[in-house]
Protein backbone atom coordinates (compact mmCIF):
# COMPACT_ATOMS: atom_id res chain seq x y z
CA UNK A 1 0.00 0.00 0.00
CA UNK A 2 1.20 3.55 -0.74
CA UNK A 3 2.20 5.55 2.31
CA UNK A 4 -0.17 8.44 1.55
CA UNK A 5 -3.13 6.07 1.23
CA UNK A 6 -2.27 4.44 4.56
CA UNK A 7 -1.91 7.80 6.33
CA UNK A 8 -5.20 8.99 4.81
CA UNK A 9 -6.98 5.89 6.13
CA UNK A 10 -5.41 6.17 9.57
CA UNK A 11 -6.13 9.87 10.03
CA UNK A 12 -9.46 9.93 8.21
CA UNK A 13 -8.29 12.64 5.81
CA UNK A 14 -7.88 13.02 2.04
CA UNK A 15 -4.86 11.70 0.18
CA UNK A 16 -3.84 15.30 -0.53
CA UNK A 17 -3.76 16.19 3.16
CA UNK A 18 -1.94 12.94 3.93
CA UNK A 19 0.70 13.87 1.36
CA UNK A 20 1.11 17.28 2.97
CA UNK A 21 1.67 15.67 6.37
CA UNK A 22 4.25 13.30 4.88
CA UNK A 23 6.15 16.14 3.19
CA UNK A 24 6.03 18.01 6.50
CA UNK A 25 8.34 15.41 8.06
CA UNK A 26 5.62 14.12 10.40
CA UNK A 27 5.70 10.48 9.29
CA UNK A 28 8.40 7.90 10.02
CA UNK A 29 8.86 4.36 8.74
CA UNK A 30 11.04 2.12 10.91
CA UNK A 31 12.18 5.23 12.77
CA UNK A 32 13.26 7.16 9.66
CA UNK A 33 11.44 10.20 8.26
CA UNK A 34 9.92 9.43 4.86
CA UNK A 35 8.87 12.37 2.65
CA UNK A 36 7.84 10.32 -0.41
CA UNK A 37 4.03 9.94 -0.50
CA UNK A 38 4.36 7.05 -2.98
CA UNK A 39 6.60 5.04 -0.63
CA UNK A 40 5.51 1.38 -0.76
CA UNK A 41 4.57 0.09 2.68
CA UNK A 42 5.28 -3.53 3.53
CA UNK A 43 3.46 -5.47 6.28
CA UNK A 44 6.59 -5.55 8.46
CA UNK A 45 7.08 -1.76 8.41
CA UNK A 46 6.53 0.20 11.63
CA UNK A 47 4.84 3.52 10.85
CA UNK A 48 4.43 6.48 13.21
CA UNK A 49 2.78 9.90 12.91
CA UNK A 50 4.20 12.60 15.19
CA UNK A 51 5.83 9.78 17.12
CA UNK A 52 2.57 7.87 17.63
CA UNK A 53 2.60 4.31 16.23
CA UNK A 54 0.05 3.51 13.52
CA UNK A 55 -0.97 -0.12 13.18
CA UNK A 56 -1.28 -1.61 9.72
CA UNK A 57 -4.55 -3.44 9.17
CA UNK A 58 -4.44 -6.89 7.59
CA UNK A 59 -7.71 -8.30 6.32
CA UNK A 60 -11.28 -7.74 7.52
CA UNK A 61 -12.08 -7.44 11.22
CA UNK A 62 -14.93 -8.88 13.26
CA UNK A 63 -15.88 -8.01 16.84
CA UNK A 64 -18.71 -8.57 19.29
CA UNK A 65 -19.67 -5.73 21.62
CA UNK A 66 -21.94 -5.75 24.65
CA UNK A 67 -23.75 -2.49 23.94
CA UNK A 68 -24.98 -0.47 26.93
CA UNK A 69 -27.94 1.90 26.88
CA UNK A 70 -27.44 5.44 25.63
CA UNK A 71 -25.32 4.68 22.56
CA UNK A 72 -26.35 4.50 18.92
CA UNK A 73 -25.05 1.97 16.39
CA UNK A 74 -24.41 4.47 13.62
CA UNK A 75 -20.77 5.44 13.24
CA UNK A 76 -21.46 9.17 13.11
CA UNK A 77 -24.25 10.91 15.02
CA UNK A 78 -24.29 14.63 15.88
CA UNK A 79 -26.60 14.18 18.88
CA UNK A 80 -25.65 10.90 20.58
CA UNK A 81 -22.48 8.96 21.42
CA UNK A 82 -21.86 5.99 19.15
CA UNK A 83 -20.66 2.45 19.82
CA UNK A 84 -17.32 3.35 18.22
CA UNK A 85 -16.47 4.99 21.55
CA UNK A 86 -15.79 1.52 22.97
CA UNK A 87 -13.64 0.18 20.11
CA UNK A 88 -9.95 0.79 20.73
CA UNK A 89 -8.93 -0.26 17.23
CA UNK A 90 -6.99 1.31 14.34
CA UNK A 91 -9.26 3.24 11.95
CA UNK A 92 -12.28 2.20 14.02
CA UNK A 93 -14.42 4.57 11.96
CA UNK A 94 -14.26 2.00 9.13
CA UNK A 95 -16.22 -0.51 11.24
CA UNK A 96 -20.00 -0.71 11.05
CA UNK A 97 -22.69 -2.58 12.95
CA UNK A 98 -24.03 -5.72 11.30
CA UNK A 99 -27.57 -5.26 12.57
CA UNK A 100 -28.24 -2.17 14.66
CA UNK A 101 -29.87 -1.76 18.06
CA UNK A 102 -31.96 1.17 19.27
CA UNK A 103 -30.31 3.64 21.63
CA UNK A 104 -32.15 2.16 24.64
CA UNK A 105 -31.59 -1.50 23.67
CA UNK A 106 -28.62 -3.38 25.13
CA UNK A 107 -26.67 -6.48 24.22
CA UNK A 108 -24.97 -8.09 21.25
CA UNK A 109 -23.73 -5.88 18.43
CA UNK A 110 -21.43 -7.29 15.74
CA UNK A 111 -18.92 -4.79 14.34
CA UNK A 112 -17.04 -5.41 11.10
CA UNK A 113 -15.53 -3.78 8.03
CA UNK A 114 -16.59 -6.74 5.86
CA UNK A 115 -19.65 -5.54 3.96
CA UNK A 116 -20.45 -8.90 2.34
CA UNK A 117 -20.35 -10.67 5.71
CA UNK A 118 -22.64 -8.13 7.37
CA UNK A 119 -25.03 -8.30 4.40
CA UNK A 120 -25.58 -11.99 5.13
CA UNK A 121 -26.80 -10.95 8.58
CA UNK A 122 -28.98 -8.00 7.60
CA UNK A 123 -30.40 -9.10 4.22
CA UNK A 124 -34.05 -10.21 4.57
CA UNK A 125 -33.52 -13.16 2.23
CA UNK A 126 -31.03 -14.78 4.61
CA UNK A 127 -33.56 -14.98 7.50
CA UNK A 128 -30.84 -14.62 10.14
CA UNK A 129 -32.29 -15.40 13.57
CA UNK A 130 -31.92 -12.98 16.48
CA UNK A 131 -32.80 -13.78 20.09
CA UNK A 132 -33.82 -11.13 22.62
CA UNK A 133 -34.39 -11.12 26.36
CA UNK A 134 -37.52 -9.00 26.83
CA UNK A 135 -38.83 -7.41 30.03
CA UNK A 136 -42.52 -6.53 29.82
CA UNK A 137 -44.72 -4.01 31.57
CA UNK A 138 -47.57 -6.51 32.06
CA UNK A 139 -47.59 -10.30 32.50
CA UNK A 140 -47.41 -12.07 29.16
CA UNK A 141 -50.78 -13.40 27.99
CA UNK A 142 -51.24 -17.16 27.72
CA UNK A 143 -51.86 -17.02 23.97
CA UNK A 144 -48.93 -14.73 23.04
CA UNK A 145 -46.59 -17.59 22.09
CA UNK A 146 -49.26 -19.04 19.81
CA UNK A 147 -49.95 -15.65 18.21
CA UNK A 148 -46.26 -15.04 17.56
CA UNK A 149 -45.87 -18.53 16.09
CA UNK A 150 -48.63 -17.74 13.59
CA UNK A 151 -47.50 -14.16 12.93
CA UNK A 152 -49.03 -10.90 14.09
CA UNK A 153 -50.16 -7.77 12.28
CA UNK A 154 -47.95 -4.77 13.01
CA UNK A 155 -49.32 -1.24 12.82
CA UNK A 156 -49.09 0.18 9.28
CA UNK A 157 -47.70 -3.11 7.89
CA UNK A 158 -49.38 -5.19 5.19
CA UNK A 159 -47.82 -8.59 5.89
CA UNK A 160 -47.90 -10.61 9.08
CA UNK A 161 -44.62 -11.11 10.90
CA UNK A 162 -42.82 -14.36 10.17
CA UNK A 163 -43.25 -17.13 12.76
CA UNK A 164 -41.37 -16.32 15.97
CA UNK A 165 -40.53 -18.45 19.00
CA UNK A 166 -41.47 -17.20 22.48
CA UNK A 167 -40.08 -18.75 25.67
CA UNK A 168 -41.66 -17.59 28.93
CA UNK A 169 -39.13 -17.20 31.76
CA UNK A 170 -41.28 -15.31 34.27
CA UNK A 171 -44.67 -13.63 33.81
CA UNK A 172 -42.91 -10.39 32.79
CA UNK A 173 -39.70 -11.72 31.25
CA UNK A 174 -39.54 -13.71 28.02
CA UNK A 175 -37.07 -14.77 25.37
CA UNK A 176 -38.09 -14.06 21.77
CA UNK A 177 -36.42 -15.38 18.61
CA UNK A 178 -37.27 -13.70 15.30
CA UNK A 179 -35.94 -14.18 11.77
CA UNK A 180 -36.58 -10.74 10.25
CA UNK A 181 -35.51 -7.23 11.07
CA UNK A 182 -38.42 -4.85 10.72
CA UNK A 183 -38.25 -1.41 12.29
CA UNK A 184 -38.60 -1.69 16.11
CA UNK A 185 -40.00 -5.16 15.46
CA UNK A 186 -39.88 -6.67 18.95
CA UNK A 187 -41.46 -3.62 20.59
CA UNK A 188 -44.15 -3.46 17.91
CA UNK A 189 -44.93 -7.17 18.17
CA UNK A 190 -45.70 -6.86 21.86
CA UNK A 191 -47.65 -3.66 21.25
CA UNK A 192 -49.74 -5.64 18.73
CA UNK A 193 -50.79 -8.03 21.50
CA UNK A 194 -51.48 -5.28 24.03
CA UNK A 195 -48.24 -5.28 26.00
CA UNK A 196 -45.30 -2.89 26.36
CA UNK A 197 -41.55 -3.59 26.30
CA UNK A 198 -39.72 -2.09 29.28
CA UNK A 199 -36.24 -3.45 28.58
CA UNK A 200 -34.76 -5.17 25.53
CA UNK A 201 -31.46 -7.06 25.41
CA UNK A 202 -30.12 -8.94 22.37
CA UNK A 203 -28.47 -12.25 23.26
CA UNK A 204 -27.81 -13.90 19.90
CA UNK A 205 -27.39 -13.26 16.18
CA UNK A 206 -27.42 -16.43 14.07
CA UNK A 207 -24.90 -18.81 15.61
CA UNK A 208 -23.14 -16.08 17.60
CA UNK A 209 -24.13 -15.67 21.26
CA UNK A 210 -23.09 -12.72 23.42
CA UNK A 211 -20.10 -13.68 25.57
CA UNK A 212 -21.24 -13.79 29.20
CA UNK A 213 -17.81 -12.51 30.28
CA UNK A 214 -18.27 -9.18 28.47
CA UNK A 215 -19.47 -6.37 30.73
CA UNK A 216 -21.50 -3.55 29.13
CA UNK A 217 -19.15 -1.55 26.93
CA UNK A 218 -16.63 -4.38 26.54
CA UNK A 219 -15.83 -6.15 23.28
CA UNK A 220 -13.67 -8.93 21.86
CA UNK A 221 -12.71 -10.29 18.43
CA UNK A 222 -14.91 -13.04 17.04
CA UNK A 223 -13.45 -16.53 16.84
CA UNK A 224 -12.89 -18.19 13.48
CA UNK A 225 -15.85 -20.48 14.23
CA UNK A 226 -18.12 -17.53 14.98
CA UNK A 227 -17.11 -15.73 11.79
CA UNK A 228 -17.66 -18.87 9.71
CA UNK A 229 -21.11 -19.44 11.26
CA UNK A 230 -22.51 -16.55 9.20
CA UNK A 231 -23.28 -18.18 5.85
UniProtKB/Swiss-Prot annotation:
The active site is at 102 (nucleophile). Signal peptide: none annotated. It catalyses: uridine(516) in 16S rRNA = pseudouridine(516) in 16S rRNA. Residues 1-68 form the S4 RNA-binding domain. Gene3D superfamilies: Alpha-L RNA-binding motif (3.30.70.1560), Pseudouridine synthase I, catalytic domain, N-terminal subdomain (3.30.70.580), RNA-binding S4 domain (3.10.290.10). Responsible for synthesis of pseudouridine from uracil-516 in 16S ribosomal RNA. This is Ribosomal small subunit pseudouridine synthase A.
Amino acid sequence: MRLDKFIAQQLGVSRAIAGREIRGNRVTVDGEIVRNAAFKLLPEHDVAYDGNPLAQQHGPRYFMLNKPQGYVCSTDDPDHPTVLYFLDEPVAWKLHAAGRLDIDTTGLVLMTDDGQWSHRITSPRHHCEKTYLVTLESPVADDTAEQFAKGVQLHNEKDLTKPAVLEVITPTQVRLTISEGRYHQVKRMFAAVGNHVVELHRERIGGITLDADLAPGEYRPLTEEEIASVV
